[in-house]
Amino acid sequence: MAHFVVNNFTVETILSNIKSGSIAIPEMQRPFVWDSSKVRDLIDSLYKGFPVGYIITWQNPDVKLKDGTKSVGKMVLIDGQQRITAMAAAIVGQEVLDEHYKWKRISIAFNPLEEKFEVANNAILKSSKWISDIAPVLEPAFDTFSFVMDYCQKNEISDQMSQINNIINRLRSIQNISLGVITLDSTLDIDSVTEIFIRINSKGVVLSQADFAMSKISSNETYSGNITRKTIDYFCHLLESPEDLKDIKNSDTVFASLPEFDAIKWAATKSNPIYKTTYNDILRVAFTYKFKRGRLADLVSLLSGRDFETREFKIEIEEDSFKQLHEAVLQAVNQTNYERYLMIVRSTGIVRKSLIRSQNVLNFGYALYLALRERKIDSNEIEQIVRRWLALTILTGRYSSSPESSFDYDIKRFFSYDDPTEYLKLTEAGELSDAFWKVNLVQRLNTSVASSPYFNMFLVAQVKGHDRGFLSTQVDVESMLENRGDIHHLFPKNYLTKNGVPQSMYNQVANYVFLQQEINIKIR
């Protein structure tokens, strides 16, 4: 049995459905990643009748309302967002956001004499042979006859009036071009939809479950999902590009007037290279801590109103899930929470991002911190639990593979006890037993990879212990990590080589030590 249907819709119909909200396209409010030349090429392909690829939508499940009736689920666009945004920009004249959150127009010009498209520029604007912007030509009320008369007169080609008229009509017919739209069935779960996307997508672009979740969030304006998404997006962007605060404020005045904007604008005033979060990170942290689950597929189900017991989709579950997620996101972007967590991270000895190989170590640590605060655990105890858990997860590589399963398992176990410390103690006893220290760790030190988590943990421990660098009298390891330091062989390389020790032995991390650069130069 097929889990999808294929229909053909005209460009005009698709853009109309986007405008009416029948198809949700959340990316319209996010930076447009295509350059203008790609927009030109897309319009050129439509004009020439070349295929431009399928548009893929996912029919959201029908939701059971409180009165027992059902609301038909909205279609969410999961592939084709850039193409549709490009068509809306060129054909309808819709502005797009650039990477700095500034609105701009992409004007595609057309030369009827050469039947050629170009991105509008100053030379084109001055030329009578070019239509500097095709959007007005594609409007329903456009007067083709008057335009052709005027165009031919300006360019002294009255004998080509019939030909130019046909070309302009062909240009206007772009809106009638049919595109294939694949609609995935509402019964498919998010894992299946992800797999389908990966198999269909010729470019091999992996659409993550966070992408699905974010699309689901922003497409629901009824429960302010669009505000939740903007809170996440803008916060993460400001951490990376604080100089864009003013542009965001000017380009989205409605959001700038909301308390959510006040809650995130602090991110433009702080710079912290240790924990710069992406939308994936904030979404995972907020979901894990608030819902005590780790699989983002479950978040999509909850936001669709799924009752995991009855397997029905209920409006009250959908409403409550959006409300809880919004609250969780505000806690995750809260300045006090964020900075206090970073203080714990630094007090653990983690003073540089490179000391952690997996961002998910910090993500779970933050989710755990927020969840413990919500449980109203004593602040000193929270710090101890989080520090110990960070150390454990770095040493064991706990979130290096299958992080969602590990997140789900750990967050549920932590809060299945009246005292969350119990799960920490049990995990330490199992994962960091005498066998780990006497056998496993010793074997894992048999590596020459300087980014080894075990060597990194050694540096973390040195920072925690305020140790000075090797052969240093004043400068500590923390200062060298934050500024400039070198890795050197504890037992000199030349000495070991002369005594027959092979490279595979003398380059092991157990023979590495961190020291000042100038001392390293003198030793050489």
Ranges and model annotations:
Residues 62-65, 493-498, 522-523:
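Flexible loop/turn segments at secondary-structure boundaries
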Residues 12, 36, 40, 85, ...:
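Non-catalytic, well-ordered alpha-helical scaffold segments
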Residues 80, 477-511:
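Histidine-centered nuclease catalytic patch
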Residues 2-291, 353-356, 386, 392:
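Basic- and aromatic-enriched surface patches that contact anionic nucleotides/nucleic acids
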Residues 258-440:
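A cross-family structural signal marking well-folded subdomains
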Residues 394-487, 495:
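Intrinsically disordered, low-complexity N-proximal targeting/linker segments that flank membranes
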Residues 506-524:
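Short Cys/His-centered divalent metal-binding micro-motifs
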Residues 95-96, 203-207, 370-379, 463-471:
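Short helix-capping/linker segments at secondary-structure and domain boundaries
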